Amino acid sequence: MSVHIEAKQGEIAESILLPGDPLRAKYIAETFLEDVTCYNNVRGMLGFTGTYKGKRVSVQGTGMGVPSISIYVNELIQSYGVKNLIRVGTCGAIQKDVKVRDVIIAMTACTDSNINRLTFPGFDFAPAANFDLLKKAYDAGTEKGLHIRVGNVLTADVFYRESMDMVKKLGDYGVLAVEMETTALYTLAAKYGVNALSVLTVSDHIFTGEETTAEERQTTFNEMIEIALEAAIQQ
């Protein structure tokens, strides 16, 4: 057991999907996995292990934002030996040519969080995805005929911003979308020498106001999960 995860040793697979919402973790386990067991319910942050195409995979809710995902990623790696961590979630598009329902694979993540400045004072550490996971996820998506974008995303500490000026400037520098967790995931993966990736569905556009319907969001979410699972079982 760790502080926030009550699983016993061996109950969590080496490859894991990380949605922010614990109810999404439950949905993924019930919809895509077989022989499912629930290993965690501490603070309602559900975690499950099952099999996908005969291979063990776990799925763990992380909550929203850098501090929350950092807790779960630290414990999954240090206490349970997880080797491959794939965040699955939503993001808001910044670029004009990024459309709702597109799938974004984050090659790296810039951030307005000070998390890495605590480790590297006065220095900007640039965390990156694991290339093998990225390539496998990209190939799985293109084989499905999906519109996959690969590039930089913004990991933001603030959901309700007073000004979008900085987000617009980041868009000028090619940042594709905004979310709230990837920088932390990639930094911790680098620290502990494990593999990490973020696969994101565009649920809305920050500047045009376009949004997906609930039905569209669910369909695209399912495709994103299948991409992540295919990458996870090949690693």
UniProtKB/Swiss-Prot annotation:
This is Purine nucleoside phosphorylase DeoD-type. The keyword Ribosomal protein does not apply. Homohexamer; trimer of homodimers. One of its GO terms (biological process) is purine nucleoside catabolic process. Catalyzes the reversible phosphorolytic breakdown of the N-glycosidic bond in the beta-(deoxy)ribonucleoside molecules, with the formation of the corresponding free purine bases and pentose-1-phosphate. The active site is at residue 204. Belongs to the PNP/UDP phosphorylase family. It catalyses: a purine D-ribonucleoside + phosphate = a purine nucleobase + alpha-D-ribose 1-phosphate; a purine 2'-deoxy-D-ribonucleoside + phosphate = a purine nucleobase + 2-deoxy-alpha-D-ribose 1-phosphate. Its EC number is 2.4.2.1. Phosphate binds at residues 20, 24, 43, 87-90. InterPro entries: DeoD-type, Nucleoside_phosphorylase_CS, Nucleoside_phosphorylase_d, Nucleoside_phosphorylase_sf. GO terms for molecular function: purine-nucleoside phosphorylase activity. The gene is deoD. One of its GO terms (cellular component) is cytosol. The record marks 217 as: Important for catalytic activity. It comes from the Bacteria. The keyword Acetylation does not apply.
